[in-house]
Amino acid sequence: MRKLLNMETWSRRDHFHFFSQFEEPFFGITADIDCTIAYDACKARDCSFFLYYLHKSLLAANYIEPFRYRIIDGAVWVYDQVNASPTINRPDGTFGFAYMNFEQDFHLFLINARIEMERVRHTKGLEPAIAGENVIHYSSIPWIHFTAISHARSFAFKD
């Protein structure tokens, strides 16, 4: 579900109109975060760290209302929930796009996410933008150390 944000009473209205004029109105911040304790806990429980941090980031995104905002046809919509659309590696060296519903309960999220990962690993090609507007796109590249990433984006294609 979603609801239209009331632009007349929104404190960020002027900021929205100003930055909406930019071809690329996005900004990003990167930071090093020590996840050693969480990583070690996952490994001790034979739990996927990827799915653990994916769930925790979705938990935070769903808690913070502006992370659930989406701009559609010039209007700001507030979704009740945002979900994940991560890239999933395949045995042939390619990747596919997955869609994972957010669940408060980590174990339920884990069960459903594993099923979706297996589904994507057994497909070929790409299915972009099938997840809808209320997703966060994720890419995990654990084999390199980096402090920033920029994703390819086509502004003419609603994504």
Model-derived features: positions:
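Gly/Ser/Thr-rich phosphate-binding loops and adjoining beta-strand/alpha-helix segments
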Residues: 2-5, 20-49, 68-82, 135-138, ...
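Helical lid/core segments from catalytic subdomains that handle acyl or acyl-like groups
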Residues: 90-146
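Basic, often amphipathic N-terminal segments
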Residues: 10-15
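Intrinsically disordered, low-complexity linker/assembly segments
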Residues: 152-159
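Small-residue-rich loop/turn and linker elements
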Residues: 67-99, 128
